[in-house]
Amino acid sequence: MKLYIIGNGFDLYHHLPSTYYDFRDFVKEKDPFVFGIIEKYFDYTGAFWHAFEENLSELDEFQLIRDILRSLGGDGWDEDALESYDPIFEYYTIGVFCQLKNYMIDWVRNLNLLPLSRKYPGIYPDSLFISFNYTNTLERHFHIDPNHINYIHGNAQKEACDLIVGHDMDNSNIF
């Protein structure tokens, strides 16, 4: 019996569009509003999507709050307004994170439907697998028993999917 440790390189080897740049394109097409918030309020240097998981902690909350207050007729910062508009802030922060996670699940499920243009040789079905991927490439294309696969970050194909995306600095506990 062998032990395989599988990461995104495995899906990339099979020509699956599974980079975070591919996810960026998916979000941009699916929801330009959420995409715009990400581009504007995260520490966006052009490389945000390259280090997507790490950069999730870089939300510029103060700029977001100032912009929301201005859009509601305020001057950009008002301590008293913070409490009154708390549901709006939650929508823009937690709501966007939740939507982003839902898009991640949709995107991975779409990846799971794609055919492989080539197959990695030498995968032994009776082996054990540790997978850092969200995709079901091993199950779908190599017919690996799901009981032989430990999905470290979750499996998007499961009905009650709870993907782990990002870092341990997620104060909202969404990712």
Question: Residue locations for each model-derived region?
Answer:
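SIR2/sirtuin NAD+-dependent deacylase catalytic core
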Residues: M1-F175
